Amino acid sequence: MRSIVTRWGTHLAVCLFVLPISVSAAGLADVVGEGQIRFLKTKPDPNSYTYESKVTILETSLDSGLVQIQTCHKKLDPIRKVVILFNKDRIRDIQVRTMDGIAMAEVRDNRVTLSEVQKGGSICIDLQSKALDSLGNGLYQLNAGPLMRRLFDGYLPMTANMKFSWPDKLLAVQETKPASQDGVDIKSANDGLEMDLVFAGKMTAQILLKRSD
């Protein structure tokens, strides 16, 4: 059994373990070792695992820290059983929204167990989390990561699309890590932020927000 570990608290962590037989030569060429990260201009294997998330911040979130989260794991590798594990101290109301190419998904406590996952399978999960941390002086931080796709002692390329939304002009983006570069496309507006990433390694994104006056 393999696991996808997800912690939406001070951070989100997704770790996907894959089988060597399911990895293309293009993907293997970009494997990186422990402690390394490489951002890529393009995804070497367009059919490989993709992670998507949408975080909705309400005005009440600034006091409660509670946000709405929608996550999707797409183009999964074939495997008999996989566990998606969430941080039990931060998470509530886990619900499977949709799934395809998966025989069964069981929600219990802070985990979702998937059975008989077919190649290319997908699952989308909705939840709430106390994930918005107040830093004082009107500053807030969201951390997403580490995101990774493991192969033995290395990391394979993957893509992540992360969207963050809030009421118009409620918050202003102060800083993002990583910053815009090859493999990191960032779009910012008065009501949200979107990050598209292509990378190999263990990636953590940080978003610093300030409440608008």
Regions found by a protein language model. Give the residues of each.
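N-terminal, polar/Ser/Thr-rich
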Residues: 17, 25-60, 195
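Bacterial N-terminal signal peptides
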Residues: 10-20
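Short, solvent-exposed beta-strand/turn "edge" segments of beta-rich domains on protein surfaces
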Residues: 44-45, 56-66, 85, 116, ...
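Surface-exposed, acidic/Ser/Thr-rich flexible loop segments
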Residues: 112-182
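A surface-exposed beta-strand-loop module
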Residues: 95-143, 190-204, 208-212
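Solvent-exposed beta-hairpin/edge-strand motifs
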Residues: 32, 78-107, 154-183
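Short, well-ordered beta-strand segments enriched in hydrophobic/aromatic residues
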Residues: 67-75, 125
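N-terminal secretory signal peptides that target proteins for export/translocation
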Residues: 1-6
